[in-house]
């Protein structure tokens, strides 16, 4: 949810990066975790990856300083909850979620309950304790010439 607020297609950052021509619609984000680690990844095509990195850092710093707009939080929470409900229309997605839930020791509907309990204050605290510039890295893949 936090990443969607920061860089989702309806976010101020996404709009700003598109308007400046720094990204195209391939821009994305993901969060992954494993035993004793977690990471956030922003990716996509850009002619100026350093400028994109700076804009992302600026947006994160702004959210840390000013907090999360409550209307944006509410809209994002409803959007993601709705996306989860829509996933129940896809038998493949249901099967995948059942397997993932089983291995996590949860049932398939746990995420629905978790989404209801997330608050803006929780996300603000999470943001303050993560995404530090000192732990970030920019990796650029250039075409072979």
Where are these regions (language model features)?
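His/Glu-based metal-binding/catalytic segments typifying zinc-dependent metallopeptidases
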Residues: 1-12, 16, 41
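Short amphipathic beta-strand starts and helix->beta connectors
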Residues: 20-28, 121-124
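Active-site lining segments that contact anionic ligands and/or coordinate catalytic metals
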Residues: 22-24, 37-39, 133-136
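C-terminal regions of mature proteins
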Residues: 43, 77-145
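Aromatic-anchored, glycine/proline-accented short structural segments
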Residues: 17-20, 31-33
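M16/insulysin-pitrilysin zinc metalloprotease superfamily fold
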Residues: 8-9, 29-87
């Amino acid at each position: 949810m936090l990443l969607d607020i920061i860089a989702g297609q309806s976010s101020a950052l996404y709009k700003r990066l598109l308007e400046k021509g720094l990204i195209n619609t391939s821009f994305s984000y993901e969060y992954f975790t494993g035993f004793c680690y977690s990471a956030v990844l922003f990716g996509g095509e850009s002619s100026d990856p350093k400028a994109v990195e700076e804009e992302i850092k600026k947006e994160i710093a702004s959210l840390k300083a000013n907090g999360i707009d409550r209307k944006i939080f509410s809209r994002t929470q409803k959007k993601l909850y709705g996306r989860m409900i829509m996933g129940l229309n896809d038998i493949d997605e249901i099967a995948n979620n059942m397997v993932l839930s089983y291995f996590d020791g949860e049932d398939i509907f746990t995420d629905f309950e978790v989404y209801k309990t997330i608050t803006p204050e929780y996300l603000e605290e999470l943001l303050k304790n993560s995404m530090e510039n000192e732990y970030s890295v920019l990796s650029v893949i250039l075409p072979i010439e």
